[in-house]
Amino acid sequence: MLLKYFKPVLLIFAFTNLMGQSSYQTFNKANSFYETKLYDSSKSLYLELYNNGMISKELFLNLGNSYFKLDSLPAAILFYEKGLKIAPGNKDLTHNLQFCNTLLKDKNSIKKSILINELILSFLGKSPNYWAYSSIVVMFITCLLFVFYWITHESFWKKIYFYSCTLTLLLLFVTIGLSAISKSKVSESKYGIIFSPTTKVMVEPSQSSSTTYQLHEGSKAKITGENEDWYEISFNDRKGWVQKVYLKKI
C-alpha cells in the first residue's frame, strides 16, 4: 500500500508547455532515475529544477519521495509541506506526509482548519505557474473576442462580443491577482522543519541560556519571531528559541 504512493508522478501536458522543453526533459530524466532506484541522481535533478524557480506539486512530491528513499526524513517532510502549501488536500502529498509523521519522535498537535477554510485554500492553493498559464489563456480569449467585436458589423453580435470581452478582461485581472497571491503564499513561511537529530530549544536566543525543551529531526514548529541567528518558535504551545542553522522554513 505504501509503495503505491511513493512513486513519481508525471506532469500534465499543459504544464509542460509552460515550464519549457528543457525543464520537461530534466523532469522526465529525474523520474527515470527514480524508477531505476537511483534516488540520489533523481534528487539532484529535482533540486536543480527547484533552484531554477520551478514550483509545482508534482516536483515537491517527487523531491520529497527521493529524500524519503534516501532516509532523509526532515527533507522529505519539508518538501511534502511545500507541496501542500500550493495544493492543500492533495491525497499523495497528504498520505506521504502523514506516514512520515508517524516516524517522528515529537508529536505535534497543530489544529486543522475548518472546512470552509480548506475549501478556500484549495481554490487559492494552485501554483503560481497554474495561474500564470490561466492568465495567458484568458488573455488570448480576450484578444480573440476583441477582434471579433472589431470586425463584426451586426449590432446583436457586436454587443455579445463586447460584453464577453469585458467579462474575460475582468477574469484576466482576477487570474493575474491570484497568481500574485499564490506566489506570495508560496514565499510566506510561518512554519519550519527541524533538521538536527536533536535540537535544544532555549529560553532566550543565546547558547548560554537554559534549555526549555528539545526537538528532534522532522518536527514542525511555528515561527513566531527571529533575530540575526535565532528563530523564536512555538511547538504544542511551548515557546523558545532555536538557532537558524537547525531549522529550515517551509
Walk through the language-model features, giving the residues of each.
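Boundary regions of SH3-family modules and the immediately adjacent low-complexity/disordered segments
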Residues: 159-196, 203-206, 210, 222-224, ...
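Membrane-embedded alpha-helical segments of integral membrane proteins
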Residues: 111-151
